[in-house]
Amino acid sequence: MIYNNTYDVIVVGGGHAGVEAAAASARIGAKTLLLTHNIDTIGQMSCNPAIGGIGKGHLVKEIDAMGGIMAKAIDMAGIQFRILNSRKGPAVRATRAQADRVLYKKAINSLLNDQENLDIFQDSVDDLVVENDTVCGVITKTGIIFKSKKVVLTVGTFLGGKIHIGQVSKEGGRAGDQPSNALAARLRALPFRVDRLKTGTPPRIDSRSVDFSVMDVQHGDTPTPYFSFFSKGKIEHPRQIPCYITYTNSKTHEIITNNLDKSAMYSGLIEGIGPRYCPSIEDKVVRFAEKDRHQIFVEPEGLNSIELYPNGLSTSLPFEVQCEYIRSIKGFENAFIMRPGYAIEYDFFDPRDLKPTLETKHIKNLFFAGQINGTTGYEEAGAQGLVAGINAAISIDSDKSWYPTRSNSYMGVLIDDLITKGTKEPYRMFTSRAEYRLILREDNADLRLSDKACELGLLNKQDQEIFINKKTAIDENIAIMKNTWIGPQTQKARDLEKFLDKKMTRESTLFDLLKRPELDYKKLQQIPDTNLKLEDESVIEQIEISAKYSGYIERQSKDIAKISTLESKTIPESFDYSQVKGLSNEVLQKLSEQKPTTLGEASRIPGVTPAAVSLLTIYMKKTGFIK
């Protein structure tokens, strides 16, 4: 049957990409349907019970700045918060939160249920309705046809999913869930490049069988940080609890080495490539044979759960081997495994077949987001879901689009890397992937992106007000500091001497004084009549960073301005690269296959040389494609 409602946007899949896509689309005002095989698993943390980390925390803050729900959900569900790299510079500081799985899922569902323009329906999607290379709906397992103007696929590891525990394999999208084999077959029949990837999860351990007294304790930060720019004073964190640290040892490694032939990964049972930066324990033992131990983070799954997640012990070894090596680890001598670890292999589609909006190049109005694009991690999935949902919604009645860039966000770095370079292994975000790290900090994600979120209708009125007030306070107080002068012979200068390494020798503004490493805003506040009255720590932080890193920030801003010239030069989708004289066959093939949308994107395709970009630019100027 054909369902009588036609939707603007249908999102298939209720994982971390799906919920952000559906929420973003609905916030913009599009009539949105979220289709999931099981309503009870919406927002489920299928792997580790945590959000954030190096590079990943930046993505969460950016999702939040664009009105997304991940940061607010973890603020409602986080049971331990830490700022990583807190002693390093602001560019690489990152927030990480341990989650209560049940509370996180509950928070996501609460945020979705409060969202207008959003319907949720339980059924698996088996087929797409495609007419003239344009998607116009989906067909479910029960035969219901849902019509829509746009479709966003956020299907995670469910496409042709296969679970491996030792030499035992079974079909599954994750433990306890059936795979989406019919949809996988349908997508394979379309003109997309497809391959296989692998990821894994560790065994879960009964906390009552663990000796925590022999492990290192890891407490969260005090005061407890917030992930969302809009949570403080509105959301109260749950009770905070510690995590623990233990280590593998030579006996652990010996057990694993002696049983490698039984591992699904090493026996050849798994074809897909696993994540380089989150390897299985057997992979770590083989690749880092010189190490005599590996760190294991023992993470609680929730305030009312007895399950522990031993982060660092992902495996595809047989269950009996898992039991043996787990019990060789300090504190786990009597451990009882409640759920075995496993590897999962699944289809992904070459992200080079996507536009920067995450719409597919071959099928109009069809968007891909999350693990279907070859990424790993909740945060990477959420960022893609947000971008896909935005573009699906704003392009319903126009050619309007918006996508992040390398110079304004880690989301932009993520998507640009995927669509220009593709990936052969699960892609994980790191700060090292970004060229403009000092500008793309966690702390200023709202200042970088929330103006655009307001413009697109993604922020509610309350959050808009919080953002505008913060931005105004920063601008006004920087202006005050740049216009307040202190001379070397004044009383204010003498008051400052107790803080200074050396006396003032010339007149300076308060802003210039703030550049000195020995001074901060609160010290300057102690000087009488400076008119510095701020108490908001987030505003003070922005002012201090603006002053202390001003030289570096200005330099990166100039670099961005140079690059933006190429980014602003768009290339028509129908552009014929064979007309550009002097391009090598390799460059011609790559440009013709990938169809970059801008000269900047073309310049980042592996194998496309600066000389080739120059030839392309000259030709486009000559023929009037660019002015």
Curated annotation (Swiss-Prot):
Gene Ontology biological process terms in this record: tRNA methylation; tRNA wobble uridine modification
PROSITE patterns in the cross-refs: GIDA_1, GIDA_2
Localization: Cytoplasm
SUPFAM superfamilies from the UniProt entry: FAD/NAD(P)-binding domain (SSF51905)
Chief site of localization: cytoplasm
Residues bound to FAD: 13-18, 125, 180, 371
A molecular function (GO) term: flavin adenine dinucleotide binding
The protein's required cofactors: FAD
GO cellular component: cytosol
One Pfam family of this chain: GIDA
Record key words, sorted: Cytoplasm, FAD, Flavoprotein, NAD, tRNA processing
Protein residues bound to NAD(+): 274-288
Keyword Cytoplasm: yes
Subunit structure: Homodimer. Heterotetramer of two MnmE and two MnmG subunits.
HAMAP family per UniProt: MnmG_GidA
Function (record text): NAD-binding protein involved in the addition of a carboxymethylaminomethyl (cmnm) group at the wobble position (U34) of certain tRNAs, forming tRNA-cmnm(5)s(2)U34.
Family (UniProt): Belongs to the MnmG family.
Protein name: tRNA uridine 5-carboxymethylaminomethyl modification enzyme MnmG
Origin species: Francisella philomiragia subsp. philomiragia (strain ATCC 25017 / CCUG 19701 / FSC 153 / O#319-036)
Lineage, opening ranks: Bacteria, Pseudomonadati, Pseudomonadota, Gammaproteobacteria, Thiotrichales
